[in-house]
Every structure is written in structure tokens, then in C-alpha cells.
């Protein structure tokens, strides 16, 4: 069944920060159980079925090699650590995306989160999923 904005999820907000100067370089949300799982997702990629071609039972999506993820795989990535900004709790997926947007925008107002491609995950969800 397709994910919906009104689905109840157990999600939290994480951030990557530089160990050499404490700058926040990226913030995101996850429905993963641990912050380590979210880190592994970004650093190493994954093979979830939603990323398989439709002919093989997936949705045809591909793993996205964003600027952020590419940087994690470079020497620069060794200076980045992940941590919880908002501990996971039960909420709707829409509430999680709104919280993520708020946390990204507050950091960008301070000149941080410069590796976030978008400042509005909810807008992007609606754009790409048509909801």
C-alpha cells in the first residue's frame, strides 16, 4: 500500500554536524528505528524494493545520489557525525515532514544546513507523489 501523509509513523529528526567546527550541514527526517540506520542509509545506499524497476515489483524509483550523500562518501564525510535533533515519536507523516521543514529552515536562517537540497520536504512530497 502506498504511503500517505495521514499515516501514523514513528519518526524523528536527525542532523549531521561537522566534528571540526560544530556546523550543522544537513537535517532530515526518518522513520528508521535508530539514527545509525539513517546514517547507514545515506552513507552506503540500500536495496529496498521501492527502488526496483516496476517490472520486478518495485515502484521504479532509484536511489538518489544527492550532493549530500556524495559528500558523505568523500573525505569530508569523515568529519560528519549524525545525532538526533528530535527523538522519534508517534505522529502523522505530514506532521513529521512539517517538523523537518521547520528544523531545516531555522538552521538555514543561521547559514547552516547548506547541504539540504530543499527547505520544504512536505512541498516535495506533494510534488513527487501528487498528494
What residues fall within each predicted segment?
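Short, flexible coil/linker elements and helix-boundary hinge sites characteristic
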Residues: 76-77, 81, 111, 129-130
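GIY-YIG nuclease catalytic motif and its immediate N-terminal context
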Residues: 1-44, 94, 98, 120-131
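Short amphipathic C-terminal alpha-helix that caps PH/PH-like domains
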Residues: 97-107
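Coupling/hinge elements of helicase-like and P-loop NTPase modules
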Residues: 108-122
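Conserved short loop/helix modules at catalytic or binding sites
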Residues: 31-93
Amino acid at each position: 500500500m502506498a504511503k500517505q501523509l495521514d499515516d501514523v509513523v514513528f519518526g524523528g529528526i536527525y542532523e549531521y554536524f561537522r566534528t571540526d567546527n560544530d556546523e550543522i550541514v544537513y537535517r532530515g527526517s526518518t522513520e528508521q528505528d535508530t539514527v545509525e540506520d539513517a546514517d547507514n542509509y545515506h552513507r552506503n545506499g540500500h536495496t529496498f524494493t521501492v527502488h526496483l524497476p516496476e517490472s520486478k515489483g518495485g515502484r521504479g524509483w532509484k536511489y538518489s545520489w544527492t550532493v549530500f550523500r556524495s559528500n558523505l562518501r568523500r573525505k569530508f564525510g569523515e568529519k560528519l557525525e549524525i545525532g538526533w535533533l528530535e527523538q522519534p515519536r508517534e505522529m502523522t507523516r505530514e506532521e513529521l515532514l512539517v517538523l523537518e521543514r521547520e528544523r531545516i529552515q531555522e538552521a538555514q536562517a543561521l547559514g547552516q544546513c547548506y547541504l539540504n537540497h530543499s527547505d520544504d520536504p512536505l512541498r516535495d512530497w506533494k510534488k513527487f507523489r501528487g498528494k
